[in-house]
Swiss-Prot record:
InterPro entries tied to this protein: P_starv_induced_PsiE (IPR009315), P_starv_induced_PsiE-like (IPR020948)
Any single GO BP term: cellular response to phosphate starvation
Protein's UniProt name: Protein PsiE
Name of the gene: psiE
Cellular location(s): Cell inner membrane
Transmembrane segments: 15-35, 55-75, 83-103, 108-128
Record bears the keyword Mitochondrion: no
NCBIfam families tied to this protein: PRK02833.1-2, PRK02833.1-3, PRK02833.1-5
Entry's Gene Ontology cellular component terms: plasma membrane
Family the entry assigns: Belongs to the PsiE family.
Organism: Salmonella schwarzengrund (strain CVM19633)
Pfam family, one: PsiE
Its membrane topology: Multi-pass membrane protein
Keywords for this protein: Cell inner membrane, Cell membrane, Membrane, Transmembrane, Transmembrane helix
Length: 136
């Protein structure tokens, strides 16, 4: 089998990069639609006087922030020269674990473990933003 030339490899990489960009653009548009639906859901939950709707409202707010963070991650990808900054994934992880604590707080041990995971992610975020590892 003949090895591929450098120009062919670059062509393949360009095609795959364009497919990735199109997929992320499509995902971003889908997330914007879900963000709009979540806005309507939050407006409905806001005006329901029941106690259960307050939990639904808080859960909806955290989900709203998750959609928002994923959209911000996609925007940052295109603005930073097709690169995903690590700290955005850490932000999304922290928000997802906070949502898990709010929604599923059955045992104190689970909450403690989730809190330890958040602490670990915050330490990771601090390390990523330190001068030694700072890229931007």
């Amino acid at each position: 089998m003949m090895p591929l030339s450098r120009s062919r490899l670059e062509f393949i990489a360009t095609i795959l990069q364009n497919v990735l960009n199109l997929g992320l653009l499509t995902l971003g548009l889908i997330l914007v639609v879900f963000l709009g639906k979540e806005t309507v859901h939050l407006a409905d939950a806001l005006f329901v006087p029941e106690q259960a709707s307050k939990y639904e409202l808080v859960e909806g707010l955290v989900i709203y922030f998750l959609y928002f963070e994923f959209i911000a991650l996609i925007v940052k990808y295109f603005k930073s020269g097709l690169h995903f900054p690590l700290r955005y994934f850490v932000y999304i992880g922290i928000t997802a674990i906070v949502r898990l604590i709010i929604v599923d707080h059955k045992t104190p041990m689970d909450v403690l473990l989730y809190s330890a995971a958040i602490l670990l992610l915050v330490i990771t975020l601090w390390l990523c933003n330190s001068n030694r590892l700072r890229r931007e």
